[in-house]
């Protein structure tokens, strides 16, 4: 019979690898030095460290003249939050080549160029908020006058789109619609537009795809526009955008896919990469879980089984709120000496 002590204190094999270690604060004097430890801390900190390593590799290859086409996908809450400015900066600096987002990721970017969203609280009387005309996104408040102001700009914009479509004899695709919205911002708005993703995508000719362009306030405004005018002519074409998006993946020598959240943007990007045998680099930041079978929670390894991520790809998934980790990731890759 095996002795209890022998069961508990079973002999082990030696494990080779990186020792787990965190920063000793007497030895570090900057955030950069703290982040250098992340890969050795363990848990999700290690995953963030891996993401830094992957994105730096992509940046190095691009700096060497190698073509790595960077796709960025994000859900609307990224733009609701203060991550909007980080995304806009990345586009301005030429770090992103293709964007896929939801309708909220478009309209909220425009609205913030008109009036800011306000820091609120998670725990409020939501029925009272409704009475006051204040919408809530987590702990971010969006007074309804933002959408009223948005409508003042969008109705004339729809009229412009309708004229463009009549002149060219065919509908704008969603990405062309968003490009024209960027041009419209450039013409109509002041300095506040310079923190806008749409504006910088227009200036840098970065396509923004939004396959569900009507699923939000833009759709509400289109409904009002069409119903009040009996319009049957204004059409947004999403079919030709799928060709354009897929070809941006197919024609790339290498691709990197950075996904904040899940949902439609995530799948649109990795599915486009299926047509080239999978993306070469992938960074997922999500709080979604895999055990319900959702696309949002599917880890990169599941994407490998579909051919959407290459078997030999360099990839990592960080289970965390993007507002916590994305600023650290961007700063470490783009700004740390």
From Swiss-Prot:
<comment type="function">
    <text>Catalyzes the NAD-dependent oxidative cleavage of spermidine and the subsequent transfer of the butylamine moiety of spermidine to the epsilon-amino group of a specific lysine residue of the eIF-5A precursor protein to form the intermediate deoxyhypusine residue.</text>
</comment>
<dbReference type="Pfam" id="PF01916">
    <property type="entry name" value="DS"/>
</dbReference>
<dbReference type="InterPro" id="IPR022899">
    <property type="entry name" value="Deoxyhypus_synthase_arc"/>
</dbReference>
<dbReference type="GO" id="GO:0008216">
    <property type="term" value="P:spermidine metabolic process"/>
</dbReference>
<comment type="pathway">
    <text>Protein modification; eIF5A hypusination.</text>
</comment>
<keyword id="KW-0520">NAD</keyword>
<comment type="similarity">
    <text>Belongs to the deoxyhypusine synthase family.</text>
</comment>
<keyword id="KW-0808">Transferase</keyword>
<feature type="active site" description="Nucleophile">
    <location>
        <position position="308"/>
    </location>
</feature>
<dbReference type="InterPro" id="IPR036982">
    <property type="entry name" value="Deoxyhypusine_synthase_sf"/>
</dbReference>
<dbReference type="InterPro" id="IPR029035">
    <property type="entry name" value="DHS-like_NAD/FAD-binding_dom"/>
</dbReference>
<keyword id="KW-0386">Hypusine biosynthesis</keyword>
<dbReference type="GO" id="GO:0005737">
    <property type="term" value="C:cytoplasm"/>
</dbReference>
<dbReference type="InterPro" id="IPR002773">
    <property type="entry name" value="Deoxyhypusine_synthase"/>
</dbReference>
<protein>
    <recommendedName>
        <fullName>Probable deoxyhypusine synthase</fullName>
        <ecNumber>2.5.1.46</ecNumber>
    </recommendedName>
</protein>
<dbReference type="GO" id="GO:0034038">
    <property type="term" value="F:deoxyhypusine synthase activity"/>
</dbReference>
């Amino acid at each position: 019979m095996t002795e209890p002590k022998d069961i508990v204190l079973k002999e082990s094999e030696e494990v080779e690898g990186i020792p787990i270690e965190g920063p000793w604060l007497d030895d570090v004097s900057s955030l950069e030095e703290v982040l250098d430890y992340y890969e050795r801390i363990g848990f999700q900190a290690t995953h963030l460290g891996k993401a830094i390593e992957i994105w730096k590799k992509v940046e190095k290859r691009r700096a060497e003249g190698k073509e790595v086409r960077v796709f960025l996908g994000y859900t609307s809450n990224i733009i609701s939050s203060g991550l909007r400015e980080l995304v806009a900066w990345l586009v301005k600096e030429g770090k992103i080549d293709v964007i896929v987002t939801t309708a909220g990721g478009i309209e909220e970017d425009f609205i913030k160029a008109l009036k800011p969203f306000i820091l609120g609280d998670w725990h409020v009387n939501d029925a009272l908020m409704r009475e006051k005309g204040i919408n809530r996104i987590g702990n971010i408040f969006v007074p309804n006058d933002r959408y009223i102001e948005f409508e003042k700009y969008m109705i004339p914009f729809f009229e412009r789109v309708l004229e463009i479509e009549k002149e060219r004899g065919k509908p704008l695709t969603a990405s062309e619609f968003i490009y024209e919205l960027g041009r419209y911002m450039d013409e109509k708005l002041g300095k506040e537009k310079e923190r806008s993703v749409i504006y910088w995508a227009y200036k840098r000719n970065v396509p923004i795809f939004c396959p569900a362009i009507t699923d939000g306030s833009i759709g509400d405004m289109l409904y009002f526009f069409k119903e009040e005018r009996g319009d049957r002519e204004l059409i947004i074409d999403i079919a030709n955008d799928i060709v354009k998006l897929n070809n941006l993946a197919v024609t790339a020598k290498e691709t990197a896919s950075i996904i904040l959240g899940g949902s439609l943007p995530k799948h649109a990007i990795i599915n486009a990469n299926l047509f080239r045998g999978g993306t070469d680099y992938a960074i997922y930041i999500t709080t979604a879980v895999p055990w319900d079978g959702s696309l949002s929670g599917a880890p990169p390894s599941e994407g490998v089984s579909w051919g959407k991520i290459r078997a030999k790809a360099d990839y990592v998934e960080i289970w965390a709120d993007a507002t916590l980790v994305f600023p650290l990731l961007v700063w470490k890759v783009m700004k740390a000496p």
